[in-house]
Swiss-Prot record:
The modification Phosphothreonine is found at residue 479. InterPro entries: CSN1_C, PCI_dom, Rpn7/CSN1, Rpn7_N, WH_DNA-bd_sf. The lineage of its organism: Eukaryota, Metazoa, Chordata, Craniata, Vertebrata. One of its GO terms (molecular function) is GTPase inhibitor activity. It comes from Homo sapiens (Human). This is COP9 signalosome complex subunit 1. The PCI domain is necessary and sufficient for the interactions with other CSN subunits of the complex. Mediates the interaction with CAPN8. The N-terminal part (1-216), which is not required for deneddylating activity and CSN complex formation, is nevertheless essential for other aspects of CSN complex function, such as repression of c-fos/FOS expression. Residues 476-491 have a biased composition (Polar residues). The keyword Zinc does not apply.
Amino acid sequence: MPLPVQVFNLQGAVEPMQIDVDPQEDPQNAPDVNYVVENPSLDLEQYAASYSGLMRIERLQFIADHCPTLRVEALKMALSFVQRTFNVDMYEEIHRKLSEATRSSLRELQNAPDAIPESGVEPPALDTAWVEATRKKALLKLEKLDTDLKNYKGNSIKESIRRGHDDLGDHYLDCGDLSNALKCYSRARDYCTSAKHVINMCLNVIKVSVYLQNWSHVLSYVSKAESTPEIAEQRGERDSQTQAILTKLKCAAGLAELAARKYKQAAKCLLLASFDHCDFPELLSPSNVAIYGGLCALATFDRQELQRNVISSSSFKLFLELEPQVRDIIFKFYESKYASCLKMLDEMKDNLLLDMYLAPHVRTLYTQIRNRALIQYFSPYVSADMHRMAAAFNTTVAALEDELTQLILEGLISARVDSHSKILYARDVDQRSTTFEKSLLMGKEFQRRAKAMMLRAAVLRNQIHVKSPPREGSQGELTPANSQSRMSTNM
């Protein structure tokens, strides 16, 4: 339950009721990590093709953990992709999961009398030859890169040392050793000789920090990259390379803000991404930008912001073309067709729950979108029939009454519920007296500012300088300046 909860009555507002619960520990905000998705409509091959490197493998593993129907297929794909790397430990882990999933599928087939046995159900055997060969190759490459780096340091050539650290970081990342990869990429900072090198170092650190889910580190290095002269000093039209870098930084920042549950800030970052320069498969796909940005904007933007920043955005329109369902949801919401909008949201919920970065926020975002729809629906009315309102939101009157009561308690709707007649009444606010109160407060503020300006002008005109009082312990000491001033006053 959000904090604080405010209770209103007709005579006036009473003190808000405080509940001693940390919002982070609130079960409503806590993500459910043990959920199962039964009916996804996900094209796994197309989905995996949108990513590269470790991100592709991690996303496939996440799908396997939460979707029984896609588990075996996702693990088989992850197993084939991991064999293109030096990550032997992950290969063995995925193979173990695949063996367990396959045995489970076989047991289900044996228990079902009408089931037709599938070909290729047996898991592939553990490729021990590949494991041993890959371990040796990884060790030899590590020794070579380490020797090269020592030679570069002996020659004291900064550019070679920087590249040596980057190569070592790339190798550690390929082996799945994220902590050592982060150390190597960070050490390259001391050997950067241009803004381009600093940006490259920041992007490498950001990438590994996302894999480690160290979101404060991500935002810190996004800020460092944006403050480099190559990015900060360019105004107006940017060249293609700079725009591509800026898009990567905004995507990473949007992902970090999403993880921190700062949905409005996440939407603002993602809306600044350029479609023509969105090429960051190590972290996000353009479809992710459309979904994350669209849902966060729906949950936090008012109608004017939604129209100005999303619907009228020429760049974000191109992202939405990749996800027509999200585009239609945004337009239905803006056109106040809330029943259709919420129905379409429910239809795509299963697929969203298979996204490793969005899944923990789906319930919260859906609740905020629904609450914003209820608030916008009621805002123009003095009273509203809850039967018609329930029909508009495709729900029951009893469920709607509970939702409205919660919104009133949270102070999001200024209204009262007539439970007998099932009518929602807006609280009677005297607009005339409210306007007079605002006018009086504004007048007092103008008076205060005018008096302050007149006082400052008088002080400057009369050349009055107010000296700060002497520091403690320095009263008995004489400096040349105050010694001379004391002598002049004595004379």
